[in-house]
């Protein structure tokens, strides 16, 4: 794919996804705005800030916008993530965020590619493993147990968040587990973003003994098929360094990077 194609995909991402808001919203989640920023509140893991662009704000005006977010979430006593992208302007935004108390976490690469070729591939899993779509809280809790084993961190908010999304609009998200017997060995979900050509892929954590056996790839192709059934034409993933090479081999293209900047009161 040419640089021009990658730029076209990035433009589609900027205009269709970056400021998109779930409709209907999950229970307890609200949205408001501060200038160019879209603020999501009531999420199970804190607030979230996104935007298509910053309307050309620089210098003191930009510092003022950042300071208002710090004060807003300090008053609420909750953390907030500012989702920064590598092509965002102005270029000094990361240092301004750090100066205001935001801390960068691990960067990821935004990759995008066409649904059709992936949807045409058969999901192939190792013998003894099956893929299954799930909606129950019991299954979501099993996903959390797998995630906590992988990351050695509390992931309980994940089950609550997914449960609320499914309850708000079961047609907007599908959660898929890879199981070996009674054990969840990997899981991922796909969101069908309304009013766009995009489906977005999330999750993908896999227990160590089951890695490098094609399960992650199978989950990607399975969810691509679900996206094709819903007339989505593009897949988007915030890819870790581990998953990015797999996704690139499957035809997805890096278009930018993204880094969570987190403020914690």
Regions found by a protein language model. Name each.
Residues 1-72, 89:
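N-terminal charged segments
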Residues 30-36, 92-103, 172-188:
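Conserved beta-hairpin
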Residues 40-52, 192-201, 211:
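A conserved beta-turn-beta hairpin within the catalytic core of GNAT-like acetyltransferases
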Residues 61-138, 237, 259-263:
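Acyl-donor-binding surface of acyltransferase catalytic domains
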Residues 62-70, 202-208, 212-229, 239, ...:
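Conserved acetyl-CoA-binding loop-helix of GNAT-fold acetyltransferases
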Residues 155-209:
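A conserved beta-strand-loop-helix scaffold within acyl/acetyltransferase catalytic domains
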